[in-house]
């Protein structure tokens, strides 16, 4: 998926939660998060029930900027979770975390 709107529409239609990952190619912590957490088998297994979209801020397109402002993002990485009812979960990931912590966060989202 290429946009936050596409992810939300798909999630609504399927009754699934959403992961929106704001990242950039110059962001060291974003790369760490990919390497340490997102690539881990346990995280991938738990994340499979989500509709996921990675929003690339490397070029700061208008679509990225609109989503960035909509969610009040202050830096990257920022990962937000939206539950299956469409509500944003109050806890965000704003640094590189390990797989155990990420699995715990994913399991908290219905």
What feature does the model see in each segment?
Residues 1-51, 55-110:
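Proteins that catalyze or organize thiol-disulfide redox chemistry
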């Amino acid at each position: 998926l290429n946009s936050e709107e596409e992810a939300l529409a798909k999630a609504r239609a399927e009754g699934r939660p959403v992961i929106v990952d704001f990242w950039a190619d110059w962001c060291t912590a974003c790369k760490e998060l990919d390497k340490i957490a997102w690539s881990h088998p346990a995280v991938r297994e738990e994340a499979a029930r989500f509709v996921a979209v990675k929003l690339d801020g490397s070029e700061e397109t208008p679509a990225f900027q609109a989503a960035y402002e909509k969610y009040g993002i202050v830096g990257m990485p920022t990962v937000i979770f939206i539950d299956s009812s469409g509500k944003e979960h109050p806890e965000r990931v704003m640094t590189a975390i390990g797989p155990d912590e990420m699995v715990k966060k994913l399991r908290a989202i219905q």
